[in-house]
């Protein structure tokens, strides 16, 4: 199977450094039925997610997650080839993404001096 095309870069909701240092929460990549988890749509990633190969980040901290990105990560996970997924954590035995918890983005904006 060939590598799926990388999804387009989406907008940043905040500075990468700010998202990375928030506590966040972990949400599984797949839902209870083993399908791409729609609960991730619109959430803000806290970590850099990089499949290797090719070694090009799919998500960076502060980036908004889209259905296309969720579908891409799911396809990569299901491929038979051995592709390392740097930044994707396992939580309760499930591959998960660390995303900003509710209220963290607003709290960041309130603290911002920009």
Language model segments and positions:
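Non-catalytic terminal extensions of PLP-dependent enzymes
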Residues: 1-114
């Amino acid at each position: 199977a060939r590598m799926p095309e990388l999804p387009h870069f989406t907008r940043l909701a905040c500075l990468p450094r700010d998202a990375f240092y928030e506590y966040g929460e972990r949400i599984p990549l797949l839902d209870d039925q083993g399908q791409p988890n729609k609960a991730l749509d619109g959430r803000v990633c806290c970590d850099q997610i990089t499949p290797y190969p090719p070694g090009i980040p799919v998500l960076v901290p502060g980036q908004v997650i889209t259905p296309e990105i969720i579908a891409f990560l799911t396809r990569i996970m299901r491929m038979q080839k051995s592709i390392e997924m740097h930044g994707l954590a396992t939580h309760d035995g499930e591959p998960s993404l660390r995303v900003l918890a509710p209220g963290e983005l607003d709290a960041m904006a309130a603290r911002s001096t920009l």
